[in-house]
Amino acid sequence: MALDEKIYELRREKLKQIEALGQPAYPHKYEFTHTLPQVLSDYSDKTAEQLEAPRVNLRVAGRIMAIRLMGKAGFAHLQQSGQRLQIYVKKDAVGDKGFELYKLLDLGDHIGVSGYLFRTRTGELSVHVDEITFLSKDLLPLPEKWHGLTDVELRYRQRYLDLIMNPEVREVF
């Protein structure tokens, strides 16, 4: 069995586990309050104190482009329209089912999150997640982050991957 087939089967199994948690595999719609570019343009210049004064609650959606799990918490980067926003997921905030869902997510999956904005200790604008909604599973892996799509023929045949991975190509469209 080839590596891509193994990854495909592993992700299909994760999709079944997500459905077992009570999440639909491909929900029909997701209501969000802000797009990621809106959040970044409206709040990127705000300080931590300004974000806390009247707490900014929001619902956003995007594709997971980076994910890190550290015990009972984790970070991920969501991407939408070529812009990225960090999310912070804590087991105490999302509950056991929500954190189990987070542990089943992979790069390329689409999720929706609701929560409030804050700044991390390093000063990065982030969403402290209260609720995770699964939107769709990426069954095939995205190309490597650093090497990307180097094969020109593959870039033309799989144009959608080229648009996902290369911001300069997306700018042309």
What is each of the regions a protein language model found here?
Residues M1-F173:
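Class II aminoacyl-tRNA synthetase catalytic cores and aaRS-like
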